Amino acid sequence: MSRIGKHPAIALLDSGITFKEVRQIHAKLYVDGTLKDDHLVGHFVKAVALSDHKYLDYANQILDRSEKPTLFALNSMIRAHCKSPVPEKSFDFYRRILSSGNDLKPDNYTVNFLVQACTGLRMRETGLQVHGMTIRRGFDNDPHVQTGLISLYAELGCLDSCHKVFNSIPCPDFVCRTAMVTACARCGDVVFARKLFEGMPERDPIAWNAMISGYAQVGESREALNVFHLMQLEGVKVNGVAMISVLSACTQLGALDQGRWAHSYIERNKIKITVRLATTLVDLYAKCGDMEKAMEVFWGMEEKNVYTWSSALNGLAMNGFGEKCLELFSLMKQDGVTPNAVTFVSVLRGCSVVGFVDEGQRHFDSMRNEFGIEPQLEHYGCLVDLYARAGRLEDAVSIIQQMPMKPHAAVWSSLLHASRMYKNLELGVLASKKMLELETANHGAYVLLSNIYADSNDWDNVSHVRQSMKSKGVRKQPGCSVMEVNGEVHEFFVGDKSHPKYTQIDAVWKDISRRLRLAGYKADTTPVMFDIDEEEKEDALCLHSEKAAIAFGIMSLKEDVPIRIVKNLRVCGDCHQVSMMISKIFNREIIVRDRNRFHHFKDGHCSCNGFW
């Protein structure tokens, strides 16, 4: 061993030389006949296998020339394959270790790499078998193996198993604690993750990233941004992975100013902008209603993948630019990028917002005929929405009946919305009943059905719907509107008076109401589910969250700054009408992202053209 340890080739191989250089050294030693020691071969196997997964076949050829492959060489192949596109091949080399008789035995490295392979495969049964093997071979107390098992069970979504492994460790080290923080955050238990995180004497960027990502994942976007700010205060270096989570949190909140600041932070700190990070930036600007900036980032990217194109297409569709969405799709195909299933969801939405039924049908048909993509439930949902929005309700019903899979609630929701828009009571009742069969606690179905009855002043059935909700314990989800002013996020809830500036907001809203009435405003009271007089209904509508947000925006933002609002529910008819009128009376641009789409209100018009 001492002689081999002094071989100059080993020092070169361990110094991180390029694959080309490794190959040159290997060829020279092979030709000279000096490449006979199995230990030296093992170092070549490692150098080639770990350089890039595309060289794994070459590494295997080197291994096959070894008379007695070492455990080091076989472990290197397991390690390389566990991080490759084919992690299942790791087990081929594990079986070679077992078939060697008593010459070789798996060690803790073998087991750790196999656990990582299971993590890549996301196969529960295989993972359990490997865990059992670690116990039988006495490696279950190895800290590297334990950390790997925590990551494996987190990947499988088995948080209880993560806790069992973690609790079995007498003194978990820094790496193990970080893995557990990551596991809990990934599985949605941000409370325990934060508790463990706060108790760590030192925290590396991985732990910080896990907390930011975890909060963003469960929708606690404000807390995700708070952790990011704490990370900066403690001087922890922020990387591109963390910035993706930060940008995602800004996107959820519709916090465009903070998103812009995060973008400038990336540029100031020279964080490498990968395709994934740039795609997240496109998504941020698109979902905050700034399509101009989204497309600026998009066209400025040197490299784009199918997800980048799909993100831009989705942004254009969401913001009501259906024709531009279809133009971009044509450019995408001309650029040689093959669309995937996600792409077609965006394309079909683009057709829907501009009412291009025939073109939408052609794109739907091309999925299978031209690209070999089998349409899934979401694609059929888009097709139903396309026909329903265009008023072709019978065709929409026919598509639902002929779908190869059972329609989900969102499909019936599209038909229900259209039934109300086109005043088809019979189909509206059918769609709502189908929705409630699938989701008995879906408050939206009850509300829309009651609105359909209210449109025709059928207060007996409105009352029946309300009683049905009450008897089943279904409550209408309270409306919440979020907006950002000077980098600070403000939340407004329906009927809530807790905002510190409520008195000023109320005064501004009263002035807005006065000017609306002078302009001829008459409240659309159909969203109010009670048979009460019109004045009481108007009072109820005044409490809607986006109206408070608009009032706050008018009093807080300069006239040339758009008022941007994110709402958790679909905008009601009255708020939609009011927003259009305010945009004209006050000469303000108002951008509302509700649960369905964007509404760009300007000069008394909305980008949705009355259908949302």
UniProtKB/Swiss-Prot annotation:
Repeat as UniProt keyword: yes
GO molecular function, one term: RNA binding
Positions of region (Type DYW motif): 518-612
Location of region: Type E motif: 411-486
InterPro entries listed in its UniProt record: DYW_dom (IPR032867), E_motif (IPR046848), Eplus_motif (IPR046849), Pentatricopeptide_rpt (IPR002885), PPR_At4g14850-like_plant (IPR046960), TPR-like_helical_dom_sf (IPR011990)
Domain of life according to the entry: Eukaryota
Renumbered residue ranges of the record's region Type E(+) motif: 487-517
Family: Belongs to the PPR family. PCMP-H subfamily.
Name the UniProt record assigns to this protein: Putative pentatricopeptide repeat-containing protein At5g40405
Protein species of origin: Arabidopsis thaliana
Recorded name of the encoding gene: PCMP-H14
